[in-house]
């Protein structure tokens, strides 16, 4: 049984990020039904309940390190995590997860990422350094691949794929009506 740690912007009630997490989990379970998944989350109880995964609080360094140590693969997944427009701290957080994973000798994959913009010169250099340590990088568009290459990330590590939410099955008409009724629409 594979043990995978998933890092992203999960547990913050963002519908798009939660949809990405759902798509990632479904994709991984299609490959290996009994895969052991742990998600770093801002709300681990909610994430565990919604997605039937193990979850740890992403701002508890000891819990993160323990989860990382117990995993075989660190998957940094979904969304535009590597950018410095909204916050340089969030960029440092996600790069530290990738870097720590490699420090602990784990396989690390960036999964269906949107990259950039990364404007600060130091942030571009750090992103290049850390991403070059990753085992595999998949990005959701050509612009993200170009951004990584411009920063000096090895082209051989980068594969252009699709946004992970595109793998989700659409809701049926009846299911959609039920959701709208529950929402009072």
Task: Annotate each PLM feature.
Residues 1-185:
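Active-site anion-handling motifs in enzyme catalytic cores
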């Amino acid at each position: 049984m594979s043990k995978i740690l998933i890092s992203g912007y999960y547990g913050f009630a963002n519908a798009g990020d939660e949809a990405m997490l759902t798509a990632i989990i479904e994709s991984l379970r299609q490959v290996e039904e009994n895969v052991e998944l742990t998600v770093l989350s801002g709300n681990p109880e909610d994430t565990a309940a919604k997605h039937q995964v193990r979850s740890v609080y992403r701002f508890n360094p000891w819990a993160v390190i323990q989860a990382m140590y117990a995993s075989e693969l660190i998957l940094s997944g979904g969304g535009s995590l590597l950018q410095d427009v909204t916050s340089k701290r969030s960029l440092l957080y996600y790069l530290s997860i990738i870097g720590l994973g490699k420090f602990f000798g784990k396989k690390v994959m960036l999964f269906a990422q949107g990259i950039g913009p990364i404007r600060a010169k130091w942030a571009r250099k750090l992103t290049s350094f850390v991403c070059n340590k990753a085992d595999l990088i998949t990005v959701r568009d050509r612009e993200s691949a170009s951004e990584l290459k411009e920063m000096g990330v090895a082209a051989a590590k980068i594969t252009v794929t699709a946004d992970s939410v595109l793998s989700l099955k659409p809701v049926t008409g009846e299911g959609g009506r039920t959701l709208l009724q529950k929402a009072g629409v």
